[in-house]
């Protein structure tokens, strides 16, 4: 594992050197700048984190013969009008910068590393009790709003799965054996986010 915060200051050469020193069989890339509002306000920073960094890791994976498994996002589907399960082969034009950059990363990395695996993760959540920091997630946001008597806004046009992070972890090892490509990775959800939040 790389030190916490490593990618905040690393460049491509340092990234490659670290990967070469570790010489892993698999590179599991989970880092991202995923706050969609922040990405829209800071597109250069978002591009570096969400496109350049995965490309650097792809080049390092090529040189070390490591398999790259990278987390993408269901935000690549943002703006899709089609309802129901969405196939990975759907033509996409993401409605937000974060989704656009994650899609671009998938495409560029697959050009460099056709055997790389890209997991389009849904909105994940964890629960307190493991001694780990908990970021905002749907169940905790709903609980917090209910306790404070605050309203939350959701869109009927937003169709997303919501996945318990422990299920994601349990399925990571099998995902490492997948052939190169893009995969939806998480719980399905036939409802829009208004219905899901209720």
Q: Where do the model's predicted regions map?
A:
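NAD(P)H-binding glycine-rich loop region in Rossmannoid oxidoreductase-like domains
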Residues: 9-49, 62
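SDR active-site strand-loop-helix element
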Residues: 27-31, 68-74, 80, 119-121
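Conserved catalytic-core motifs of eukaryotic protein kinase domains, centered on the activation segment
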Residues: 37-44, 79-83, 130
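Catalytic phosphate/metal-binding cores of nucleic-acid and nucleotide-processing enzymes, i.e., regions
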Residues: 46-47, 82, 165, 181
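Catalytic helix-loop patch of NAD(P)-dependent Rossmann-fold dehydrogenases
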Residues: 48, 52-56, 76-119, 124-125, ...
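A short helix->loop->beta-strand "cap" motif at the edges of active sites that frequently abuts
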Residues: 63-67
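NAD(P)-dependent short-chain dehydrogenase/reductase
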Residues: 110-160, 166-167
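Mid/C-terminal beta-alpha module of Rossmann-like enzyme folds, strongest
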Residues: 171-172, 177-198
């Amino acid at each position: 594992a790389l030190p916490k915060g490593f990618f905040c200051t690393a460049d491509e050469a340092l990234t490659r050197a670290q990967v070469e020193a570790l010489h892993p069989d698999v590179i599991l890339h989970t880092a991202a700048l995923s706050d969609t509002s922040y990405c829209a306000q800071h597109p250069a920073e978002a591009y570096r984190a969400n496109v350049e960094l995965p490309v650097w890791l792809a080049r390092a994976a090529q040189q070390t013969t490591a398999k790259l498994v990278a987390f993408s996002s269901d935000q690549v589907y943002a703006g899709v009008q089609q309802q129901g399960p969405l196939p990975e082969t759907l033509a996409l034009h993401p409605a937000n910068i974060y989704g656009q950059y994650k899609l671009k990363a998938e495409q560029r990395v697959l050009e460099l590393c056709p055997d790389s695996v890209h997991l389009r993760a849904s909105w994940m959540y964890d629960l307190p009790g493991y001694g780990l920091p908990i970021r905002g997630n749907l169940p905790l946001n709903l609980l917090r709003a209910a306790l404070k008597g605050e309203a939350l806004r959701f869109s009927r046009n937003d169709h997303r799965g919501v996945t318990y992070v422990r299920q994601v972890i349990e399925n990571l090892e099998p995902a490492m054996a997948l052939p190169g490509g893009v995969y939806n990775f998480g719980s399905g959800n036939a409802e829009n986010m208004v219905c899901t939040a209720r």
